[in-house]
Amino acid sequence: MKKIFLAILFVASFIAFDASAQFRYGPTVGVDFTTLKFKQDLFTVDQSVGYQAGIQGEMMFPGIGFGIDIGAMYEQRGATLNLGEKKVWSSQGYGSHRSYLHYLSFPINLRFKWTRMNGLEDYIAPYVFGGPNISFMLAHSSIDALDYTTADLGLQVGLGFEVLKRWQIQASYNWGMTYCVKTKILDDHSAKNRTWSVRVVRFF
């Protein structure tokens, strides 16, 4: 994790001192489709739908298509856990429970945008991106069978289209790299976030 933070700091410092870089920002909203990937398949986990909203910034180097995007956003993740499928939990009265995970997330991505398409880029320009996503838990469901961690580190990749140089529509997948939830009864039964996202950004 230390290496990731150092890499982020290096990239941010490099861009901050480049006078030719173009920065803009705007609001973003989207939908999350999340599940929790446990170490062992002791019970089924159903994907749940959440939402996200926040601010996204973009800094691009003119002429070469490379840049960086950063964001600060609220995200609702989680999944439905069918704990009642195992006697160890059903005997305590547990059944199917929706586990809500509320995060403040800070994605930082390197991106490449196709900007030399003979004028077509003024109307539509595809782009790809990838980088770390650092999230801090704000709140969670009260499920006594679970323990929760305070922070989550993920890696995400995605693609999208810029429309009329103002709107961006993108889809991404986030791999949780650290465990966010674990069961209290079984010490080694923990889970990581797995999230598909669809998001719209409107830049000023």
Locate predicted features.
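Transmembrane beta-strands of outer-membrane beta-barrel proteins
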Residues: 23-29, 51, 66-70, 106, ...
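Outer-membrane beta-barrel proteins
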Residues: 58-63, 110-119, 163-165, 177, ...
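Residues that define the transmembrane beta-barrel architecture of outer-membrane proteins
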Residues: 21-23, 45-51, 100-106, 124, ...
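Transmembrane beta-strands of outer-membrane beta-barrel pores
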Residues: 31-35, 74-78, 112-114, 132-140, ...
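Outer-membrane beta-barrel translocator domains and adjoining extracellular loop/strand segments
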Residues: 37-43, 80-87, 121, 140-146, ...
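Outer-membrane beta-barrel "beta-signal"
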Residues: 32, 107, 190-204
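Glycine- and aromatic-enriched membrane insertion/assembly motifs of diderm outer-membrane
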Residues: 24-26, 35-36, 42-96, 168, ...
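Short loop/turn motifs that connect adjacent beta-strands in outer-membrane beta-barrel proteins
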Residues: 19-23, 61-66, 115-125
